[in-house]
Amino acid sequence: MKVKICGLNPSRDVQLCIDLGVNFLGFVFYTKSPRNVSLQDIEILKTYNRLKSKFVAVTVNPGNEFIENIVQKHFDYIQLHGAETKKRVEEIKSMGLKIIKAIKIRNENDIDKYKEFESADIILFDTPGMEKSIEFPKNLISKLPKGDRFALAGSISQNNIENMKKLGVTFCDLSSNLETDAKIGYKDHQKIKRSIDKVNELKN
């Protein structure tokens, strides 16, 4: 099972995630989010030996200037979490970037929207609301396409990740459930370790 952890702090969380072998490390560029990182924050990213981990810039309707000056210099992937059209995704793809396109699923009718974004390298099925920890409905998970190109987000943690595997999910995106109880946006390193331990256990 592949894992992406989103909403990381560039100086506090990255080395741990690399050491644990987390596949994708997500950094949020969204000023309304308590997980938002600044341009100054990400300067430290160039100092890490990423090994097999990929760095992801999580964005909402990004402009070309931001993509050219920030994403292309520091990140392996860009995650598009806004209202980007098929044409816009193709434009960004033409800039030489690997793309994760988030699809917000409210009901079964939303699932086929992913077919519009053939240029995306990864499709992330998520619940509505970028900053809301809402569990993905189990009745819809069984209807999602499966495989390494398709990831699932939505209140996933060490407590339900085994159920995700049983439902055929092979790529999970974790975020808010890895945070401390005291501070939103602040990752709990013990929760990260326990979650990755659980993933590794499921591989055996």
Predicted feature residues:
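Conserved N-terminal beta1-alpha1 strand-loop-helix module at the mouth
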Residues: 1-204
